[in-house]
Regions:
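Short consensus segments that form the blades of beta-propeller domains
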Residues: 29, 74-76, 108-112, 151, ...
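A short, acidic/glycine-rich surface segment
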Residues: 68-72, 103-107, 178-179, 221-226, ...
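Vicinal oxygen chelate
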Residues: 21-30, 33-44, 63, 81-100, 105-133, 157-163, ...
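Core segments of cupin and vicinal oxygen chelate
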Residues: 30, 40-91, 154, 193-248, ...
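Bacterial N-terminal signal peptides
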Residues: 4-15
Length: 337
């Protein structure tokens, strides 16, 4: 299958960043099957779980995960893992990981830094969520410290950006829930990431991972968005958006310019490190594509790790500095769930 990046002219000054694929019957090409879960490395699992429970009513059960493959997967000899797999509305899963046994270096990104990540929680009552967050002394990133009015695909909405105890970004947006939405304040979830380059991000996710992302090539200066993320006036941005298969979760990548940026990359074990885990149909083929493109492989010796239960996996770094766990499953269910 031939894949190429194009910028399609839509107007004199506006284009579309997308990928064109030639017709092919090759269904065996390595590609994403599903987003398994978003990942967030934490400094203390109990503290972070308490935050999400007290602020948003989201619950998770902490447990030790004594899998001997973890040190190889994360290239951290001697490390041990305690985790909680939180099940969120819309079949989304959010894995909180607490690594022990080795030194860790916490890190916090600016929202405009490539590699920064945010979980977006859509709520029925944003004022209640903000009040709960203030009780925990959660840092508020949004300029002015209060929700701002933004425009979403569903119309006008109130939104605010804050940090959890590890500095991970949490965007809270109030919107009317769809019919049949789960009970509780949080009724929907999406993911948001900051990218260094829209073109490089499209080459990685569209061209190799097989995730369909697209967006305008032109930059915008929407004041409400800049206020939401705490960016200075004059900052410009553009987005790539798509839907992650599996939970059918909306995902967006934002590139900023006109503001100082520093690529944010932490080791898998470092508190504040974001990641995502994606299931693919052909891990060996996918890894060959990634290595041929010069992708940094994190796992020990750059090799696929047998995780047990028919699961084989590896960690790589995307062009923006974020860690991506890519895995193939041929046997039983992943024991982390």
């Amino acid at each position: 299958m031939r894949i190429a990046l194009f910028v399609f002219p839509a107007a004199a000054s506006v284009g579309l960043i997308a990928w064109a694929q030639s017709e092919s019957s090759d269904q065996a090409k390595p590609r994403i099957l599903s987003l398994s879960h978003a990942i967030h490395a934490v400094g203390d699992l109990d503290t972070t779980l308490a935050f999400y429970r007290e602020v948003f009513g989201l619950n998770g059960m902490p447990r030790d995960f004594p899998n001997p493959a973890v040190p190889l997967l994360t290239d951290a000899p001697g490390v041990t893992l305690r985790l909680s797999m939180m099940r969120l509305p819309g079949s989304m899963q959010f894995e909180l990981t607490h690594f022990k046994g080795l030194e860790r270096k916490p890190g916090r990104a600016a929202y405009t830094d490539p590699g920064a990540a945010s979980i977006v929680l859509y709520v029925r009552d944003i004022d209640a969520a903000v009040a709960n967050a203030q009780k925990t002394n959660a840092p508020i990133v949004t300029t002015g410290g209060a929700p701002v009015e933004i425009t979403t695909a569903k119309g006008k909405a109130r939104s605010i950006l804050l940090r959890d105890p590890d500095g991970f970004f949490v965007q809270v947006t109030q919107e009317q829930p769809a019919a049949g939405a789960p009970e509780g304040n949080v009724h929907r979830v999406s993911l948001a990431y900051t990218m260094e380059s829209a073109e490089a991000t499209a080459r990685f996710y569209n061209g190799m991972i097989g995730l369909e992302l697209s967006g305008p090539s032109a930059f915008s200066k929407d004041p409400a968005t800049l206020k939401l993320v705490g960016a200075p006036e004059g900052t410009e941005f553009r987005k790539l958006t798509g839907v992650m298969p599996g939970p059918n979760a909306y995902v967006e990548f934002t590139e900023f310019r006109g503001v100082p940026r520093k690529k944010f990359h932490l080791r898998v074990r470092d508190p504040g490190a974001p990641a995502m885990a994606v299931q693919v149909n052909d891990l060996t083929g996918m890894l060959a594509l990634l290595k041929a493109a010069g992708t940094h492989v994190i796992s020990s010796k750059g090799q696929i790790v047998d995780f047990g239960g028919g699961t084989h996996t590896i960690f790589v770094e995307d062009p923006n500095g974020m860690n991506i766990e890519v895995f193939e499953r041929t046997g039983s269910v992943d024991t982390r769930k």
